[in-house]
Design a protein with these regions (language model features):
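Short hydrophobic/aromatic beta-strand micro-patches
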Residues: 134, 215-219, 253-255
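Conserved small-domain helix->loop->beta segment predominantly found in fold-type I
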Residues: 168, 179, 183-249
Length: 308
């Protein structure tokens, strides 16, 4: 999208890596020669500083806002942004696309007329790996359609599109229950971990998260130790060293856990597993890990697909 909609004389505002923004965005913009500055951010609330942002939007200096958050427990509220007609938004919803589709989170396309919503299918929207581009602006649509194919992509695969459509139909039928459970489990797990002594990021609404993610805040040494111990038992986590995590911590996503339709007792077992990892208790790690592996049966999916 950036290659199709931006020129090297343009300036944009972005969510930076320290704010949870994807690390690739500054690199891409630098390669394109596009000037960028940070979107004002309130780290205490894990949220955009809308007053400062709206003041910057009034300046007329910027062509786009680019939201590209990989670490996100409190999504931006697009309805609070006062955007002049001369500006647009590129909203990378890769992490939350499934939550948006199910109505768990607000759909950015419904609040501002000149916006491009992009995302990948490997997070909360389970589907064959691919990207999706949506816009409510005919001008952006024409630029994207003209530039992306054939300038950047020439290998459209019909079988890939068919598989994506089946996955989207699956979410249309089963996604609302699945996506709501994803956020519910994230908050349940955060609460259980908090009771076990973990320092979990918490929002002022008394929730831990509005998404599938929760943040465990640790110092750098403990973060690296926790991550490595988990990896030793083939347990995948994301370690972070950035200001959003008070400098260091672990990010956990619950989208795959929710896909197994785990109940509260299963979530409590998962919390105990993470507690055992923290304390290097090999006996408990193996016990809870093996019990949870037996519960990994996919749900929220069609048992049979017949094409007539």
């Amino acid at each position: 999208c950036a290659m199709s909609l931006l020129k090297n004389t343009d300036s944009v505002l972005i969510t930076t890596p320290d704010q949870g923004g994807h690390a690739s965005i500054p690199i891409i913009l630098e390669k394109l020669g596009v000037n960028y500055e940070s979107i004002p951010y309130d780290y205490d609330n894990y949220q955009i500083d809308y007053k400062e942002l709206n003041d910057l939007c009034k300046s007329g200096l910027y062509k786009f806002l680019i939201f590209c958050q990989s670490d996100i427990i409190n999504p931006p509220d697009i309805s609070k942004i006062s955007l002049p007609d001369s500006m647009g938004i590129i909203y990378d919803g890769t992490q939350t696309l499934g939550l948006i589709a199910a109505g768990v989170l607000k759909n950015p396309l419904e609040y501002i007329n000149n916006i491009v919503l992009i995302g990948g299918t490997h997070k909360t929207l389970p589907a064959p790996a691919c990207g999706l581009i949506m816009t409510n602006c005919s001008n952006y649509q024409q630029q994207l359609q003209k530039n992306i194919t054939p300038n950047y992509l020439r290998n459209t695969q019909p079988n890939h599109i068919a598989a994506l459509l089946l996955a989207l139909i699956e979410q249309e039928n089963l996604g609302k229950s699945y996506q709501n459970l994803t956020v519910k489990i994230a908050n349940q797990l955060a609460e259980e971990l908090s009771e076990l002594g973990f320092n979990i990021a918490k929002l002022k609404s008394n929730k831990y998260t509005y998404t599938h993610q929760l943040f465990i805040l640790m110092n750098s040494l403990d973060t690296n130790d926790f991550y490595q111990t988990a990896e030793n038992y083939n347990i995948t986590l994301n370690k972070k060293h950035k200001r959003l995590f008070a400098n260091d911590g672990i990010r956990i996503g619950t989208q795959e856990i929710a896909r197994y339709n785990w109940n509260f007792s299963n979530v409590k077992m998962l919390a105990q597993l993470l507690y055992a990892i923290k304390n290097h208790n090999e006996k408990d790690i193996l016990y809870y890990r093996n019990k949870l592996i037996l519960l990994k049966t996919p749900a929220f999916t069609f048992e049979d697909i017949s094409i007539k």
